Each structure stands twice: as structure tokens, then as C-alpha cells.
């Protein structure tokens, strides 16, 4: 029925695109007039648009003219003009939706349309990319057109100073990675002076590779952490124990659930080994956690698939892109357990200081949009979590790539033999081949098999990270064979015949030019540096020479069928498979793709492989004989849908928990900002004092009789510990009216505070209030994050007792939050009343971040973490007023 409807009325995307026809016609109609404008007249359009917006016009009102302006500006500065399909895509992005655009169709240029339009509001636009290289490349490339039209452009990359960050965020347009934007938000909410904040309010973000950032990364929260104080010896002891255990006897592995658990026999062995009576007792929680993480490290985490060992460190491999994730660590002790497994030095565990998921960070923007080559399969998730639908943008030229049916084999061995045969055939006729594998291990096995056959090839995986650009630049040349681990997010088009820009730069390096000069030869920035001017001249000369060569080779490669894609197994996500396929057939070029599948592949083995194997066995096929059957194709797709559904469930689960923390985080960060912005916190302190009194009286009041009985001695003693030196002598057995008593207590507390303020001085007292409020809020919040994390880890057991774990987490989390708020109020007031006239009080961070990472979020991906530690001579963060070394740091 749906297919019939779409045949008559068009697909959802086709209908949505049709609605934009009229506006796109308007934009194209302006081309003739705008092309006649002088540079000065075109540049002045920006000023005119800003004036019109200030007078009440909306961005939608000026959209056709603004798009026509940036279109003409791009032509004059970059020599590129937006195609009609890019105008559609730009409008979809402006509307806060996801534009699905095929590889090589010009997403980077398309984004300039909504970026320019929205930057005119003066509130800032963030363009989010997956890595620093792409952020710098796109900023440098597109800044020429923005600068030409009078807009400022900044870039946020790892390692730049706070001052540079602030400048970049105050530009009209800011490029950067999802990690950097998220960490800056967290860091801004840890500063102790308002001027240290770098970000402006979050206005509009365009997320490139939106599926990678908002779907794949969604299970891994951003974490800023400080140094923990636990010993690392336990990791080695537990690792030695776990290595003595036998699979299926002492522990069981559930690959589908990605979990490993001790059997009853295993529990008994653990209790005997560690001399404990009951591993499930509360006092043994930490030991049980160590054992679980060591079991995971030794049985689920695979060397050269999930991580590599480099320079004595464990470096995580991104599941989806195959890139090395330098600086990231698994959380909850898993990273340390892997270090112990590999016999490396174990780093100390960390304490979480601030955390947020990408889901909740990006939902804070007033408007959010995204672009990618593959998003339609995840549209339900984009709608339910981000309220963004997906619109497929038509290609500029028809796609002529041939997607051949899957070839399914009984065994891994038979599959590999057929892959080698296919590569050999294509290589002989000069057709370039890109082979996609799902792990480093598989790519190296295939490379070894090709070497035996004498077929020259390049390998691109996390271990060859540094040579990535070089390998990709050559992947479309005649007869080249490239093996790549997960091509997602590589950010570089594969050009048939080769990339003349890269070839020219490589030749310049061979001629002795330095890396810095070479990196600047394609920059559009004006310069009076004679060496650079000369280098640019040489580059132009070489580029023309190589362009003639690659153009000739481009035609030769087209004649033999273009780039051929081979998938060595299906990924658990259809989207990743589509990304690999999308590498061929860009801009109307020919190309082909085929996936090779074995019933021994993880996906088939875990989801329906046994049934398939039974059917295939009955057919009596040879190992290297391919099977093609609708039942098999359906089985593969169903397996992928199952995994996608499970992963969506995990991400939704993570979000349900983080939504609880998110509401609490908003309250705390809001309070911090009030303190940073507030000139005078005296009224706020008085309201805290009144709250404490409101909370305290019911604690000492009995409702057993018709007239409330107040334990006056208990109440007086309690209040005297908080409001030091306040005179509460009037609290005696005569107090019958609770409301009257409240007023008297508050008045006495305010009077004592006024005496304290007179003694210290009003101006100094205002700063002391801010210092103590910040210190208490930060200390309590960081402890609360840990407590909530522990609650979450233990809450799963409630499901056994027919209690919804998420609901239990919400209720108990709320109670814990209220307790923290009460504790903040009491500690703040007590510290203020106990401050001495000669006390030295200055703003200091409770903890200083030393690591940024991703948390593991129920997945095998790493947290994004940053770390902090109190100095020996700093005031102790517990609020005692003593130096750290004399108090908690003993």
C-alpha cells in the first residue's frame, strides 16, 4: 500500500523538496542581477540584511536574497557555484532538519547557505565536524567567502588557549568538533570567574556526519574527570585470578548482550581465592566490580579490534570509523583492567567532575540541523530524540553505480577465496578496488593473503592513521587495491584517476619544501611572504601538470567500470554498509559494489546463523560456492534490523538515565551562573537561611498531639551549630506558634549575620559569599555525580524485584538531589558564620581537569574524559578552612 501511495504521490522527501521549488526558483532568478553587482555592492548586502533583521524582518523573509548573495560570493572567491540541489539542501538545513546527501555531492559548500543566513542574526553559528583536520580544512576553505562578505570565522581545535577559544566563539561562524564544543560547555560550568567562560548561548548548529555524531557517539557521554586516589595493585591481582578461570565452567560469555558473568562455580572460586564469605555482600561490591571488569577485558575486549597497544599505552579503536581515539579512556575501571591484561603500567582511576551526553548537549541549541550521506535508516531515532526528520536531497547527476547482490558462503575460508578472486580479476583489468573490513585483524589477514598472490595493495586502518590522506588520495587510481577498516567519516572523496592536489604537494615535499609551507600553498589567505608566494606559483605549475595526468587516467578508469567496492562482511548497521557503498559512483561516475558474507560472520552467527547453516548444509555446497537466495537476503536484513533496534534501545536507555541528571545539571549550572553574575548575593544567602529554618523546625516538632510539641533544646542545639554566635535563647518551652517562632529565628540569624558582616566589611563579605557558594556547590555536585553513578550501577538489580529501574532511578535520584540541595544550604551558611576576620579567602577550583574522555555508556566505546586534583597547599575542598595537606590530603 505504501509503495503504491509513493508511486502516485512521490516519496516523503520528494513531496518535501517540491514544496521548496518556488523559493529555489526565486534564488536562481536573482543570479543575473547579482552577477552584475560590483564586489563592494555585493559585500554591502550583509550590512543591509542585518539592518532589515534589526527592523523586524525574519531570516525566512531574507532567505532568497541571502542565498543568492552567498552563491555569488562563492563563485567569486572559490570558483564554485551552488547547484540547484544544494539550494534545496541548504533550505532543509535552515529549517532544522537533516539533509541526506550522497557522497561527493558537495555538503561542505551546501552548508555555507544556511550558515551565512543564520550568522546574520549575530547570535553565532556552530559547524560541527568529526575531527580537527576537517574542522581546520573546512574553516580555512570556506572562510574566504565568509570574510569576503564581511563575516568573521573561527575554529576550535584541541590544544588552543582559552583566549583563542573565546575569540573563536565570538566570531559569527565557529567550526569545531563535537568533542571540543561539548567539553567547552562543561568547562564553562566549572569556571570561577565569569570572564573565564568561552561560549555564548547555544544558537544554531549544523552537524556534519550527523549520524556518526548523534547516533554512533550517543552511547558515550563526555566526561571531565580528576585524579582518583585508589591503588592500582588490585587490577593485577584480579587479572591473575581471572586468567585461571575456565570458559563455560567458571564464567559465561553472552556476545549478543556484550556481557560476561561468573557461574556459581566461578563465584565459589572467587570467594576462596580472595578469602571472602560472600562475594555479593555490600563490603565486597568493589571486589566484584574489579572481577567483572577483568572478565570483560580478558574475554570481550580484543587486541587490534577494540584497542591497540602503542608506546606502552592502550589506545581505543573507534568501532565505527576504525580511527585511533587518542586521549580517550574507558570508564569504570575497564581501561585499567585492559592495561593489567596486557601487562602495562596501570593508570590511576579518575573521579568524575562533570559529564553530559551528546544527546543532551545538542538538544540545548535553539536550532539544530545535520547533513550526512546516510541517515534515512535511523530516521525514527532522529525524530523521537532530536525532533528532526530526514529529507533525501536528489543527486546533481544520476547515480549509475551497480550494487550487485550479496554473495553468501558457508565458511569464512570460502568467502576469503572468492574475495581474492574478485580483487585479482578487477586488478588485472586496471579497475581500482576498495575493500572494506570491520576490524584491523581482518584487514591484516586479507593483506597477507593478497601478498601471497603478489597483488600490490595499500592498507588503511587505525595503525596507518598518519598515512590516511595519502592512501585515500590514491585509492581511485588505475589498478590500485586499498583495504580499509570502516570507511565511515573519512572526510575525503576518492577521485577516479587520482587527486592532483595531493600529487602536487607530494612532489613539492620531494623537492625539499617544508611541511608548513606546503600546508599553506592551497590557502586563500592574502600574504606578502615571498617564499610562500613563490611556493604557490610552483604548486600551481605542478597542479596543472598532474591535473592533465589524472584527467586522462580518470577516463581510463571510467572505461573499465570505475571504483569497485567490496564489503568483506555486513556491519551491524545498514547505514555503515551504505557509507562504504557510497564511496563509489560520486558525481555521476560509474562504479560497482558487492558484499561477501559468510555464515561464520559475527552478525550471522549471533542472529539467525544456525538456522541458515542448517539449510545450507542440506544443499551440500562447496566452501567457495556462493549462495544467492531471497531468504538469505531477508535473514541478513532482519539481523541488521535486530541489532539496530537493540542499539537504539541502548541509546534510549542511556538518555532516560541522563535526562534525570540533565534536569539536575541545569539547576546546578543555573545556580553557579547566578553566583558568577551576581554582584550582591546577600539576599540569596538570607533566602538560604530562611530555607534552613523551614527545614529544621519540622525535624524537631512532634505531631502526636493536637497541639504541635517542639523539642526546643534539640532545635536550639541544631541551629546553633549552623548559625554560629546567633542568640537563640528565646527558643524555650513557651514557643507554641510555629510561624511566629520561624520569624524570630530568621530575625536572630539575620542579626548575627549583620554583626559578622560589620566585622569583616560589606565589600569583602560579598566576595566571601561568592567564594563559599561556588566551593560548596562544586564539591557537593561532584560527590553527587559519583553517588548517582553508583546508584545507576546498582539500580539494574531492581528489575529482578519487578521494579522499573529507570523509575526507581528517577525517584531515588530526586531524593538524593534534594538532600544535596539541603546540604549545600547548610554548609554554605555554616561556613559563612564560621569565617574569621583574618581568613584568606580566594576563588579556586575545587578540582582541576586533567583528562577529557567519553564514558562507556553501556557500549564498547570509550568515554570522552578531563582530569583535576587539589594542590597540597590549596584550601581543602571539604570546606574545613584547613590546607588540603593538613586535612583530607593527609
Swiss-Prot record:
It comes from Alkaliphilus oremlandii (strain OhILAs). Part of the Sec protein translocase complex. Interacts with the SecYEG preprotein conducting channel. Has a central role in coupling the hydrolysis of ATP to the transfer of proteins into and across the cell membrane, serving as an ATP-driven molecular motor driving the stepwise translocation of polypeptide chains across the membrane. PANTHER family: CHLOROPLAST PROTEIN-TRANSPORTING ATPASE (PTHR30612:SF0), SECA INNER MEMBRANE COMPONENT OF SEC PROTEIN SECRETION SYSTEM (PTHR30612). This is Protein translocase subunit SecA. It comes from the Bacteria. Keywords: ATP-binding, Cell membrane, Cytoplasm, Membrane, Metal-binding, Nucleotide-binding, Protein transport, Translocase, Translocation, Transport, Zinc. The keyword ATP-binding applies. It is found in: Cell membrane; Cytoplasm. Pfam families: P-loop_SecA (PF21090), SEC-C (PF02810), SecA_DEAD (PF07517), SecA_PP_bind (PF01043), SecA_SW (PF07516). ATP binds at residues 86, 104-108, 493. It catalyses: ATP + H2O + cellular proteinSide 1 = ADP + phosphate + cellular proteinSide 2. Disulfide bonds: none annotated. Belongs to the SecA family. Its EC number is 7.4.2.8. Zn(2+) binds at residues 876, 878, 887-888. Transmembrane segments: none annotated. SMART domains: SecA_DEAD (SM00957), SecA_PP_bind (SM00958). Its cofactor is Zn(2+). It is an enzyme of class 7 (translocase). GO terms for cellular component: cell envelope Sec protein transport complex; cytosol; plasma membrane.
